[in-house]
């Protein structure tokens, strides 16, 4: 029996470190010899750069980027375009056969807007694993951007951590969050080896975990509860 697939969520900061990105793809190539791998990625820094270049500004609320519908063409271009194809190119350089996707492809995830004040910011839930099963069955590496759409066809910006969680739930996969930090830090700046629900609530309440890390740990907790297995956060 084949082991469960592994979903690796890659932060946008990795795209600014070509050496680290190449090393990661080399390791993914090795990992594919033993199990299926699926990559889900963000691209926050790239979005910021493209928006700044076009004179656009945005704010974040609880780690989520407020996204007017008018900004979606730029965000789609950054995530589903530049970031996705850059990762696919790096995968090819490592001898991997990638397939660039978004959350709407194959109806893999169902997405809906979270709240009107956040604009085109959505949340994803598992829907159909058919496309991903076909791809990993043929040894392709799905590289999935965090762009989704609602049932009525509205493009949505999905937080990449939450998107990766939904993909892991869909595939019954293990989940690994990679970012530019070593892991979750305590109030003394020391990395926590483990983190349970009670510890997380305490660190959030005391303001140790905030913003983007709160979104990441919330997604990891949800995934751990749904998958009934640990979720890993690291660099």
Please tell me what each predicted stretch does:
Residues 1-232:
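Nucleotide/pyrophosphate-binding catalytic subdomain
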Residues 235:
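Conserved glycine-rich acetyl-CoA-binding loop
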């Amino acid at each position: 029996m084949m082991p469960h697939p592994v979903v690796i969520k890659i932060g946008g900061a990795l795209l600014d470190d070509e050496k680290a990105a190449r090393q990661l793809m080399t390791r993914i190539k090795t990992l594919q010899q033993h199990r299926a791998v699926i990559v889900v990625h963000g691209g926050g820094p790239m979005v910021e750069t493209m928006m700044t270049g076009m004179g656009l500004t945005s704010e974040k609320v609880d780690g989520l980027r407020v996204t007017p519908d008018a900004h979606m063409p730029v965000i789609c271009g950054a995530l589903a375009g530049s970031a996705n194809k850059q990762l696919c190119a790096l995968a090819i350089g490592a001898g991997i056969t990638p397939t660039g996707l978004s959350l709407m492809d194959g109806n893999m995830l169902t997405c809906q807007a979270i709240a009107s004040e956040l604009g085109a910011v959505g949340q994803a839930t598992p829907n159909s694993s058919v496309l991903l099963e076909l791809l990993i069955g043929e040894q392709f590496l799905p590289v999935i951007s965090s762009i989704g759409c609602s049932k009525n066809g509205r493009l949505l910006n999905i937080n990449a951590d939450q998107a990766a969680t939904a993909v892991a739930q869909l595939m019954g996969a293990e989940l690994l969050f990679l970012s530019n930090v070593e892991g979750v830090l305590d109030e003394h700046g020391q990395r926590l080896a483990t983190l349970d629900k009670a510890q997380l609530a305490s660190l959030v309440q005391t303001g140790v975990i905030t913003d983007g890390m709160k979104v990441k740990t919330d997604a990891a907790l949800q995934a751990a509860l749904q998958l009934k297995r640990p979720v890993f956060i690291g660099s």
